[in-house]
Design a protein with these regions (language model features):
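Catalytic phosphate/metal-binding cores of nucleic-acid and nucleotide-processing enzymes, i.e., regions
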Residues: 1-115
Length: 115
C-alpha cells in the first residue's frame, strides 16, 4: 500500500474508532488532526490515555505499542494504549498490565469517594 493510501486508511480507522467511542458515551473522543501526525494521539479526548489506532490485517503489536509508548512519553498525555481492528473483527486494546492495574485502582478509588 502506498504512503498516501495507507494514510487515508489510517485516517478512516481513527474516525471509525472515535465514532465507536462516542457511541459508547465517550463524547469527547475525536480523531486526531490529519495535519498533526506524530504531534498528537490518533484519537484524543480520552483523559489519561495516549491512543494509537491501527487498522491492519498483519499484527505488529509490539512495534505499535513501542510507538505509542514513545509518543506518550514525548507528549506526556497519558498511558500508552494501542487500539486495533482487523477486517470483520472487533476492536481490541493493548495496555500494559501495570497501567491496567493503576487505572483500575484509580477507578475503584474514584467510585469509593462517590459513596
Amino acid at each position: 500500500m502506498s504512503g498516501r493510501s495507507a494514510q487515508t486508511k489510517g485516517r478512516r480507522a481513527e474516525i471509525e474508532l472515535a465514532g465507536y467511542l462516542q457511541s459508547k458515551g465517550y463524547t469527547e473522543a475525536k480523531a486526531g488532526t490529519a495535519l498533526n501526525y506524530g504531534k498528537e494521539p490518533d484519537v484524543k479526548g480520552i483523559d489519561g490515555l495516549h491512543i494509537e489506532c491501527k487498522r491492519h490485517e498483519k499484527l505488529q503489536i509490539n512495534k505499535w505499542y513501542e510507538q505509542s509508548t514513545a509518543d506518550a512519553e514525548r507528549m506526556k498525555d497519558g498511558k500508552p494504549v494501542v487500539i486495533y481492528r482487523q477486517n470483520r473483527k472487533q476492536w481490541m486494546i493493548v495496555l500494559s498490565l501495570s497501567d491496567f492495574i493503576e487505572l483500575q485502582r484509580g477507578a475503584e478509588n474514584g467510585n469509593k469517594s462517590d459513596q
